[in-house]
């Protein structure tokens, strides 16, 4: 298979742990000829704690499980109505540095939101994407064997209240927002493919294929 090709999988609504395990298995077993993949998924409610995450940032988890992750960053929340995009890229093959990939993912979200006239921006002091001072997208990556995994989570049409149970990404009082505030009918089903197309454009439009999960 042509190495530059990217396979795109729609996984729907899934528990966090099996998808995380599948992502690790994919990364551990891939070689120089394995095509890159992008996974679109929504997760059942879960807090994920980053590799350097501090327990004090998990305030009152209540009935939502807290799962340790090996991505960068602090604690965040995933739930239905949030589009998670995992980027499983061979950075060496694509001649991308880690910082370049972070910038590229942030720009992907900025470009996606611009389609709906939402003026968003990254911040030098806090990874992710913001509208004004409010965070709309979280970002966390891990690199192994020159390949990326984990990715981004864009708030679209969800219950934001669980974010009040944590210090999102380690910032006390960080206000979260979502696309629904500006676009009433936004859904992951609509926004997910747009995110993928914006990312592919920034990767110079490599060949890609949507495949069944």
UniProtKB/Swiss-Prot annotation:
Occurrences of domain BPL/LPL catalytic (ranges): 32-207
Catalytic activity as recorded in UniProt: octanoyl-[ACP] + L-lysyl-[protein] = N(6)-octanoyl-L-lysyl-[protein] + holo-[ACP] + H(+)
Keyword field: Acyltransferase, Cytoplasm, Transferase
Pathway(s) this gene product operates in, as recorded in its UniProt entry: Protein modification; protein lipoylation via endogenous pathway; protein N(6)-(lipoyl)lysine from octanoyl-[acyl-carrier-protein]: step 1/2
InterPro entries in the cross-refs: aa-tRNA-synth_II/BPL/LPL (IPR045864), BPL_LPL_catalytic (IPR004143), Octanoyltransferase (IPR000544), Octanoyltransferase_CS (IPR020605)
GO-annotated cellular components: cytoplasm
Site (Lowers pKa of active site Cys) residue list: 135
Superkingdom of origin: Bacteria
UniProt cross-references to SUPFAM superfamilies, sorted A to Z: Class II aaRS and biotin synthetases (SSF55681)
Catalytic machinery residues: 169 (acyl-thioester intermediate)
Binding site for substrate: 71-78, 138-140, 151-153
UniProt GO MF annotations: lipoyl(octanoyl) transferase activity
Family matches, as HAMAP family: LipB (MF_00013)
PANTHER family: LIPOYLTRANSFERASE 2, MITOCHONDRIAL-RELATED, OCTANOYLTRANSFERASE
UniProt xrefs under NCBIfam families: lipB, PRK14342.1
Function summary: Catalyzes the transfer of endogenously produced octanoic acid from octanoyl-acyl-carrier-protein onto the lipoyl domains of lipoate-dependent enzymes. Lipoyl-ACP can also act as a substrate although octanoyl-ACP is likely to be the physiological substrate.
Name by which UniProt lists this protein: Octanoyltransferase
Organism: Enterobacter sp. (strain 638)
Gene name tied to this protein: lipB
